[in-house]
């Protein structure tokens, strides 16, 4: 009989369409799918496409009230993952009309919403997504971007230097401001609130902002350089977050900070708009990212979170170090670093980039290398990250035996030496240690730092592999 037929049918009949030609306006996603035993990969891929777009588990008569062909997600290609028995990469295309303009929140709710709890799958991971230019154009993106930031700070031709103030919790506002002043006075460009410094009983946010502003003004007057401190505006409500950002602007601070995953994309996008409207730079910390991106077969790869952040807005974002104490495999890290900085990125599976991405001049984001790095890493960091980056040494500045300012001096001298050596055409990878040693002859601060950290190694295998 014609008409409506109730019951359960296989997803692949509707949602697996290998003959589909993707459109320039489609959002494309590459999922790593691990089906339950007995579930064919086509069915698993189709289930992902269905459950993250128009499908549900049974046939419903209201399907007849719309055009599924126009709105459904489609699994258009499946390939086995080399070296893994039961894993497949399923490529899904979503029509643009499924997403609200300018909302990272809505995009993620659709693509990585309910479907990750789906029973027919043992595990599911979103490896990469291709955002069409027409959708990117609905986002403001980073408040300022790399070039505007350099112009604001008047710093060119080298990476920027930062330092997270430690101990991360427990200092009073006055002592905190003192530590900030010493680091900036010694030669750093930025100091940073730790991601969990918000407004706790031992140091309320307003007091911290005031003492940090004093430190900035003093260090700028003495060095003749523009200085910044990432004032963490993250708060329990958006209203409170705005209050902090407004106060930072009133103090004349150049930059504020936000924890974009714990704070949420809605709050982050609001703050990014405020920052562009009011001339504040926005530093983004990725606290909680490893909860989402650490497992190889389930969750979301950081490159997706990085793309989402560039759309939502931020001028700096933490991106691993390749050499320090936290995650990062070199090629994969550089893959998403390029996704953050460049205007156009070619598909390159060896770096984990599944799709060619065109950002249509959306401003870029500076990657921040932070976590367990010290002066001996400087040549490698300069070579790996290049000029458009922020190198952040927390313990690697404050752990200096003579104090914060000498620690900052050591880092600045090491950086300038590496940049000069690179500009002279020397090979930083091969001659790095020699370059640092030569520079330490003329700088007692650097010599002392070299002595302290000469034996430190973090010898663990990288978890983030292809």
Curated annotation (Swiss-Prot):
Domain of life where this protein originates: Eukaryota
SUPFAM superfamilies: RuBisCo, C-terminal domain, RuBisCO, large subunit, small (N-terminal) domain
GO cellular component: chloroplast
Any single biological process term in GO: reductive pentose-phosphate cycle
Function: RuBisCO catalyzes two reactions: the carboxylation of D-ribulose 1,5-bisphosphate, the primary event in carbon dioxide fixation, as well as the oxidative fragmentation of the pentose substrate in the photorespiration process. Both reactions occur simultaneously and in competition at the same active site.
Quaternary structure and interacting proteins, as annotated: Heterohexadecamer of 8 large chains and 8 small chains; disulfide-linked. The disulfide link is formed within the large subunit homodimers.
NCBIfam families: PRK04208.1
Miscellaneous information on this protein: The basic functional RuBisCO is composed of a large chain homodimer in a 'head-to-tail' conformation. In form I RuBisCO this homodimer is arranged in a barrel-like tetramer with the small subunits forming a tetrameric 'cap' on each end of the 'barrel'.
Name of this chain's protein: Ribulose bisphosphate carboxylase large chain
Upper classification of the organism: Eukaryota, Viridiplantae, Streptophyta, Embryophyta, Tracheophyta
């Amino acid at each position: 009989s014609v008409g409506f037929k109730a019951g359960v049918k296989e997803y692949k009949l509707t949602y697996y369409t290998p003959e589909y030609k993707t459109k320039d306006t489609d959002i494309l996603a590459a999922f790593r799918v691990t089906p339950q035993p007995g579930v064919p990969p086509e069915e698993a891929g189709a289930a992902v496409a269905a459950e993250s777009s128009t499908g549900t588990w049974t046939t419903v008569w209201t399907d007849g009230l719309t055009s599924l062909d126009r709105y459904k997600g489609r699994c258009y290609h499946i390939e086995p993952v080399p070296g893994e028995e039961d894993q497949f990469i399923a490529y899904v295309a979503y029509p643009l009309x499924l997403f609200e303009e300018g909302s990272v929140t809505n995009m993620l709710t659709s693509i990585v919403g309910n479907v990750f709890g789906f029973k027919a799958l043992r595990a599911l991971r979103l490896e990469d997504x291709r955002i069409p230019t027409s959708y990117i154009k609905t986002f403001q993106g980073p408040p300022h971007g790399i070039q505007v930031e350099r112009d604001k700070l008047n710093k060119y031709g080298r990476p920027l230097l930062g330092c997270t103030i430690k101990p991360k919790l427990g200092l009073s506002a006055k002592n905190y401001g003192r530590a900030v002043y010493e680091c900036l006075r010694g030669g750093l460009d930025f100091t940073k609130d730790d991601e969990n410094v918000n407004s706790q009983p031992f140091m309320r946010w307003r007091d911290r902002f005031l003492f940090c502003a004093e430190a900035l003004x003093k260090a700028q007057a003495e060095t003749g350089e523009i200085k910044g401190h990432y004032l963490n505006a993250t708060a329990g409500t958006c209203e409170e977050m705005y209050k902090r950002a407004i106060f930072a602007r009133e103090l004349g601070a150049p930059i504020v900070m936000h924890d974009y995953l714990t704070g949420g994309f809605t709050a982050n996008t609001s703050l990014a708009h405020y920052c562009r409207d009011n001339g504040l730079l926005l530093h983004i910390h990725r606290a909680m990212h490893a909860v989402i991106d650490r497992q190889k077969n389930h969750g979301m790869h950081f490159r997706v979170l990085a793309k989402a952040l560039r759309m939502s807005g931020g001028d700096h974002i933490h991106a691993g170090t390749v050499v320090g104490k936290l995650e990062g495999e070199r090629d994969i890290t550089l893959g998403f670093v390029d996704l953050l900085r460049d205007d156009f990125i070619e598909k390159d599976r060896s770096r984990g980039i599944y799709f060619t991405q065109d950002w249509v001049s959306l401003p870029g984001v500076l990657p921040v290398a932070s976590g367990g790095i010290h002066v001996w890493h400087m040549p490698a960091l300069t070579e790996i990250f290049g000029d458009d980056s922020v190198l952040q040494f927390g313990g690697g500045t404050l752990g200096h035996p003579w104090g914060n300012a000498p620690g900052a001096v050591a880092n600045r001298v090491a950086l300038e030496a590496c940049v000069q050596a690179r500009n002279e055409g020397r090979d930083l990878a091969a001659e790095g240690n020699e370059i640092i040693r030569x520079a330490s002859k003329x700088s007692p601060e650097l010599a002392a730092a070299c002595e302290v950290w000469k034996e430190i190694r973090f010898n663990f295998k990288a978890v983030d592999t292809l």
